[in-house]
Amino acid sequence: MVATTAVTAALILVAGCGGSDKKSDSGSGNGGQSTTSATPSAPTVPSFDPPKALSVAAAFPSADYQGRSALDEAQMGIAGQVALVGGFAGLNGHDVANPNNQWMIPSKSADTTTVSGASKPMAAKVDGKDVAVVAYAEEDKGNGTQKPSGLILVQWIDVMTGKKIAEVSTPVSTLDGTGSDAIGSPKLTNTAYDPETGQVAVGVSTIGNSSVLSKTLAVFADPKTQKSTIMPAITPAAVHDGVIAGAKGSNDAKATDGTILLADGASGKVTKQLPLKQPVPTPLAGGAKHAYFYGSRYTDYDAGIAVSAIYALDLSTGAVVQTAPALPQKDVVGYDCIADQATSIVCTSNGNSGPEEILGLDDTTGKKTWGYTSLSGGRVVPQRVTAAYHGVVYAQTEAQPVLLDAKTGQDLPSAAPSSGGPSSSDTPSSGVTPSSGDSASTGDTPSESDSPSDNGDLGLTLYNGKQESPVAVSPFGGVYRQLPTGNDSSDLESVCIFVKATA
């Protein structure tokens, strides 16, 4: 791929692969349903479900600020036509069709609270609205008679208005000490969510020491009830229609108490448990029908002989389907998996410097439908699968972004980058700082000391000229994180690149 600012890269896919090529009839978000505009004349951009051609259209800066933790790396997402940039300070929204529609929702409202973790922004539908969901790990030093406590905060934000529609704060621990390293301080391990309801399960671990044990737990939160439930000793893998799938057990290599389970989110009651006679399985991903885990156990510990599998747990029946790795066992460490919010799960092997594997699973059955390895010959396993959406897999090879059919694993042909940069019509006008009418209501906007203010879209002056695979996708396009470059980058932590859907 040509790395020059005068070149716009585009991925062109053939019709009939990985879903319908039909252009969406409405300004839909994730799910193809119409969305009520913030104003009657709110502008929209073309949408395709799923996007099958992507072109760089905008760059949104994520400003650095004094005191930022080295762990606070901006995370990108997209909900409907709003690009999302999240971090410890809060969540920024940039309407890709209307640069005047920008907002920032802070992660905390009390001076006694510090933030030590943030999830990536997640996109969901709540009451037909495109909503961003984000979770934070926080430490509150207490006030008056209140003891210091560890909190998990979940926010749901209407992306077209920049208003919070729900918020749930859940105390999960008592702190001994101050700061993010205090005993009892919560850390986010993973998140699982339901894109159809906005329900979320947050995996949490707490810091321990020789006298205070570390805890593992899941926090289930629902935007409709604005209530939460704590489920001890569980790491979540999937949430769908109020049902949580998760794993529990010991991490010791010789452990045999590893179990996968189903639970009711509202009550926290475990409804089904399936012992696997191995160490605790690793949650991978969740679809509408199944939750996915990776597990391994030694058959001869002294000889280092083990067997492993991907387990698909039916969210309704509790039935389990196993998929064995295609690689030799010595080359298998684990998998990273992504659900396409339709009927497919795509997984790639991780953690080894040897052979690599990619495979697809049918979420309807939980069974493997395709796959190949770097030993197969003739095909390259992508370096990273960055996103999957409605039948299309978005991935990055060493040379360029690529796309695969999520159901078959077949390549979706791409064209060479077109010459010339994006036209002025491709990029929103220079951004403006949100006015009081653009931003969230009083109490939703941070003070100057809370977070730097993103100054909106700066055109493509921050784009480095090399298009990459998006990490999040909606019918309007996708986003990815780019490191800042150039003379104007010293005050930036990163740049959010928006690639619009053109087909």
Residue ranges and their predicted role:
Residues 93, 98-289:
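Long, acidic/polar, low-complexity amphipathic helices and coiled-coil-like
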Residues 17-31:
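Bacterial lipoprotein signal-peptidase II cleavage site
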Residues 64-80, 110-126, 170-193, 230-248, ...:
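Repeated scaffold domains used in trafficking and secretory/extracellular systems
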Residues 12-16:
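C-terminal motif of bacterial Sec signal peptides marking the signal peptidase cleavage site
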Residues 332-360, 367-421:
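Loop/turn-rich, solvent-exposed surfaces of beta-rich toroidal or solenoidal domains
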Residues 149-162, 214-222, 258-264, 307-318, ...:
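Beta-propeller blade signature
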Residues 29-75, 80-86, 90-118, 161-179, ...:
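Aromatic (tryptophan-biased) beta-strands that constitute blades/sheets of beta-rich domains
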Residues 84-86, 143-151, 209-215, 251-258, ...:
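Short, solvent-exposed loop/turn segments at conserved positions within beta-propeller repeat blades
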